[in-house]
Design a protein with these regions (language model features):
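N-terminal anchoring/stem segment of glycosyltransferases
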Residues: 1-91, 98-102, 188-189
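Short glycine-/acidic-enriched loop or helix-start segments at secondary-structure transitions
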Residues: 17, 117-120, 195
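A structural signal for short, well-ordered beta-strand segments and their strand-loop junctions
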Residues: 5-7, 61-66, 106-110, 115, ...
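Charged, glycine/proline-rich intrinsically disordered loops and linkers
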Residues: 16-39, 141-170
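Catalytic core and acceptor-binding pocket of nucleotide-sugar-dependent glycosyltransferases
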Residues: 165-204
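Short, surface-exposed beta-edge/turn micro-motifs
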Residues: 2, 129, 180-182
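Glycine-rich nucleotide phosphate-binding loop and flanking beta-alpha elements
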Residues: 12, 115, 192
Length: 204
């Protein structure tokens, strides 16, 4: 069985960073995205090396992806309303499909993920049973406790209730999970079943 781990680092220009926390940050605080950009640059090599070493320790291929130029151009032309941050997030799902053409099982790790185990992910998690992701449901607050000052558009609360509203609009059950896609383990079979990009334009 062919397996691969990959990660993604796109150094989004500062001018294109969306300041999603502008309404909640203190006047003298640094925007989260500015701080993240700076920390990634400082810790770049360490964050790459830890993933390379982990992949080597469990005997699977590793790929570090750092160029999304063509994908970025495609989105800017066809979906100009989408932020660079969100283009990157769609790009990582696109890459799951690209690697799925060659590999039976794929593990994606966000750039800030640091493997701290010697266990083989692919042996611990049986990807024949489904997609391996973490849900953040425990971080969703009751709607009556949510105010504009307690969340951002990236918070689990926003993701949960926005998804709920869209499900209700389509006449579906509002029950949903808040999925953290910082770590995604998936098989080629389930990528095909997911059909993520099949109705992409309508879903947007």
């Amino acid at each position: 069985m062919k397996r691969i781990i990959f990660s993604l680092f796109i150094d989004i220009p500062k001018a294109e960073l969306d300041l999603f926390d502008d309404h909640i940050k203190k006047p003298d605080a640094v925007h989260t995205n500015y701080n993240t950009k700076n920390e990634f640059q400082i810790n770049y090599q360490r964050l790459v090396d830890c993933k390379v070493e982990y992949a080597k320790s469990i005997g699977v291929d590793f790929k570090m992806v750092e160029d999304y130029t063509e994908y970025y151009k495609f989105f800017r032309k066809n979906y100009p309303e989408i932020t660079s941050y969100n283009i990157v997030n769609f790009f990582k799902i696109h890459l799951l499909y690209e690697f799925g053409k060659k590999y039976d099982e794929v593990l994606y790790l966000d750039f800030d993920v640091v493997p701290n185990t010697n266990e083989n992910f692919f042996e611990v998690w049986d990807l024949s049973k489904g997609i391996c992701v973490l849900n953040n449901n425990e971080r969703v607050s009751p709607i009556q406790k949510i105010t504009e000052r307690t969340q951002t558009i990236r918070s689990p609360n926003a993701k949960y209730y926005n998804a709920q509203a869209m499900l209700i609009e389509k006449g579906l059950s509002p029950t949903n999970d808040v999925i953290n896609t910082g770590i995604v383990g998936i098989s080629k079979k389930h990528l095909d079943q997911l059909e993520y990009f099949t109705d992409f334009k309508d879903d947007l």
